[in-house]
């Protein structure tokens, strides 16, 4: 009854839905997105994220020639991805806007991965520079100085990005708020992980590799 006023005169709802009675009036075409298509989209999204992580791992390895840096960067990016996914899972029915896991969300995840690696590479590059300038100095001191000298640059870049994202979130409209919300979380977490996850982990891995080499050298003697 509620839809009758929108139907052509003399056409019932059943006649409108039927494609056999009058093919020129009514529902001309309909499609259903079934579980098979949804599974295909999910699988493609997972492969896209894994391909991005693998590509960045190989890029860092080729640029710095250091396995510890590659593992540290990859762990930081995986950490960022899981935090964004966890935030969406926790706040899915809490936030007053759409937070569906769709193509826009996957695009946000890939954007966060690309943004986060930028800060990490800058820090790693400064660590490599200090290691070349002061090869005899303690590695921990070189990493600490690298973090201190890139801290202002990291925070300035992140804050300018956050200001833009907050403006888009507030005034950009309802349809993109879920996408921008994922970026907001990703930028904050990515800044933290570059400073407090990727770099310290790279240091720990390098120290462990050095200890293993020292033990092997002692055994050969």
Which residues make up each language-model segment?
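A structural signal for conserved, well-ordered secondary-structure elements
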Residues: 1-221
